[in-house]
């Protein structure tokens, strides 16, 4: 018996220390959180009122029906306050409108960038056609050079004129499209960074978890206190034991449940952040690809303009040899720029498709079935 009494005393002491620590933590949290202060004020008022009402019952070792009704009402109201706080934090993060619109914008922008890549490919085909026209002109020049005096280089001049009059590989609409796509990608980077900053702040706000756990603990603690008074008033040891057993359960199970809720919340936030990071990486790569494409197009435009001027000079001044010599000097660089631009266009297209696949995989990895909060 002595050992059992000592053992019970140690357990009671351990529980007392645990509760004291929790209450101190709760008191500290109240000072830093206005919502928790409001909850605490309401809880204290209800608990004090009920205990005062029960005081008379304790003195006469009896409780009126009205007193029991008031106790029940108080416990229900406290429970409702706890539920309200939890539900405020229990919205599904993957149904968050801002996140949904952000992902939607990303995929829409990526499709527009793929459309630009298709337009770029058409421009490259026109550039290759121009290259073929130049090769034909050079061949005609070689053939006509075999004849005395070149026979006026009529066919060479005709091919040079065809090259000069050919449609520009990259027209005004193409450059407008490029500017629009580039601007949208830069804006996307800003939106993603803004959202990422918000997620970082949420992940750092661990006090939300502390507030929830404190609310659960103190509400349960108040319930235990009130039920203890009820048991004392009824002076029924079996009832007191039953109440003690019943009220001890929430302290552990509710704590585990709320901890699970917090973990789901944190995991959902991290899942969102993973998707944001993937979209950031994809957008950043797309912007870099577009920058490289712009540089290569500018180089190609310079080479095309130079060759067109040489062709114009040859046609207008009947100076075929001078024009052809200038074109020959520029042709190799032109061909190289076309090839590099084609490679970059293909790379940009592949990068965008790869990024879209990665982001879809991230979203699938973090489905909606995890009850999460925003």
Curated annotation (Swiss-Prot):
It is found in: Membrane. The keyword Membrane applies. It holds the Pfam family DUF677. One of its GO terms (cellular component) is membrane. The chain crosses the membrane at residues 215-235, 238-258. Keywords: Membrane, Transmembrane, Transmembrane helix. It comes from the Eukaryota. This is UPF0496 protein At4g34320. Belongs to the UPF0496 family. PANTHER family: UPF0496 PROTEIN 1, UPF0496 PROTEIN 3-RELATED. InterPro entries: DUF677. Its main location: membrane. It is a multi-pass membrane protein.
């Amino acid at each position: 018996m002595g050992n059992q009494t000592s053992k019970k005393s140690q357990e009671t002491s351990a529980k007392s220390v645990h509760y004291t620590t929790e209450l101190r933590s709760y008191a500290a949290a109240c000072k830093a959180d206005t919502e928790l202060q409001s909850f605490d004020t309401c809880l204290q008022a209800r608990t004090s009122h009920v205990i005062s009402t029960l005081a008379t019952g304790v003195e006469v070792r009896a409780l009126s029906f009205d007193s029991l009704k008031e106790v029940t009402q108080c416990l229900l109201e406290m429970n409702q306050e706890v539920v309200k706080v939890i539900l405020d934090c229990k919205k599904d993060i993957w149904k968050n409108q801002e996140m949904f619109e952000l992902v939607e914008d990303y995929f829409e922008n990526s499709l527009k960038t793929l459309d630009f890549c298709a337009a770029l490919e058409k421009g490259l085909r026109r550039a290759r056609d121009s290259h073929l026209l130049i090769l034909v002109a050079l061949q005609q020049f070689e053939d006509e050079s075999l004849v005395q005096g070149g026979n006026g280089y009529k066919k060479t001049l005709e091919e040079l004129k065809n090259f000069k009059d050919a449609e520009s590989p990259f027209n005004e609409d193409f450059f407008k499209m490029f500017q629009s796509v580039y601007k949208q990608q830069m804006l996307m980077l800003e939106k993603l960074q803004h959202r990422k900053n918000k997620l970082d702040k949420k992940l750092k706000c661990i006090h939300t978890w502390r507030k929830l756990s404190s609310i659960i603990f103190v509400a349960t603690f108040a319930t235990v206190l009130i039920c203890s008074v009820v048991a004392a008033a009824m002076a029924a040891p079996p009832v007191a034991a039953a109440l003690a057993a019943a009220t001890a359960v929430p302290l552990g199970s509710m704590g585990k449940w709320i901890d699970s809720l917090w973990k789901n919340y944190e995991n959902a936030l991290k899942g969102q952040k993973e998707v944001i990071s993937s979209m950031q990486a994809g957008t950043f790569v797309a912007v870099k690809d577009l920058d490289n494409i712009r540089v290569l197009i500018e180089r190609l435009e310079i080479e095309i303009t130079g060759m067109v001027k040489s062709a114009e000079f040859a046609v207008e001044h009947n100076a075929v040899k001078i024009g052809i010599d200038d074109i020959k000097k520029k042709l190799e660089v032109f061909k190289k720029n076309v090839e590099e631009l084609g490679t970059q266009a293909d790379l940009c297209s592949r990068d965008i498709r790869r990024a879209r696949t990665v982001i879809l995989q991230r979203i699938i990895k973090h489905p909606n079935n995890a009850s999460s909060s925003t």
